[in-house]
Amino acid sequence: MKNSLQGAMTALITPFKNQKLDEASFEKLIKRQIKHGIDVVVPVGTTGESATLTHDEHRICIEIAVDACKGTNVKVLAGAGSNATHEAIGIAKFAQAHGAHGILSVAPYYNKPTQEGLYEHYKAIANSIEIPVLLYNVPGRVGVDILPATVFRLFKDCKNIYGIKEATGSIDRCVDLLAHEPDLVVISGEDAINYPILSNGGKGVISVTANLLPDQISQLTHLAMNEEYKKAKLINDNLYTINKTLFCESNPIPIKAAMYLAGLIDTLEYRLPLCKPSKENFKKIEEVIKNYEIKGF
């Protein structure tokens, strides 16, 4: 069995203050996740606005996450993707050297590699480090799909590639992956289908909603993984509206607005080209979060 990171995982937002990384706020957010039952924190992914962070900021976020989790059972799965393989290797090596327990590596964006190119890209990354590697498939954002045959090949050939975060939005894709390779760890990358993936053999979630409601995402995930599906479904059904609302605009625009409205971040700031939600959607988010018990620090 390959070493893996799984369970209830949070795709962390990155807070800014006066357009600078708000390090103190970021640390507080991570400690809140630890307090409320999350298994793994995932800094500097899509939700963390990694595309508009400087290289130094990216590294600082990884260091803060690792330091915040020291002395706890919570692990750090560091975002370490790039569309330049050499750059992805550099981030992966940094993450390993600074104590991350694994890396999340998004498929190369913009340059649209072939399946063979994807294979070579991920093989090079995996061979450069010892810690676990979770593939990240999100074709709607990056413009390329890591097809199942490529996933199986990487899983077989690379000792530390243990699974995939699936954000295609396709339950069928996840079932296909699990049916053909039962030992592959499939992680839900979309809150709307967390429960269907978990109940079909998925081994965890990387959740946006968990920024706001870590306790409920943790409960849902652990119940489902313990095959207590009826109890898990009750929580999932309760989260239906918030899950939909947090994707009313491009992620992470709504979740940051929700965190601000809940008093969990002091300022509502994004890095352009991301900007604040429309007035209509801001109001919608404000109304929806009133229906949920949001735990504090």
UniProtKB/Swiss-Prot annotation:
Q: Name one Pfam family in it.
A: DHDPS
Concerning SUPFAM superfamilies, the annotation shows: Aldolase
Q: What residues does pyruvate bind to?
A: T47, I206
Q: Which InterPro entries match?
A: Aldolase_TIM, DapA, DapA-like, Schiff_base-form_aldolases_AS
Principal localization reads cytoplasm
Kindly give the CDD domains that the UniProt entry links to this protein.
DHDPS
Q: Which reaction does it catalyse?
A: L-aspartate 4-semialdehyde + pyruvate = (2S,4S)-4-hydroxy-2,3,4,5-tetrahydrodipicolinate + H2O + H(+)
GO CC list? cytosol
Family of this protein = Belongs to the DapA family.
**Record text on subunit structure and interactions:** Homotetramer; dimer of dimers.
The protein here is known as 4-hydroxy-tetrahydrodipicolinate synthase
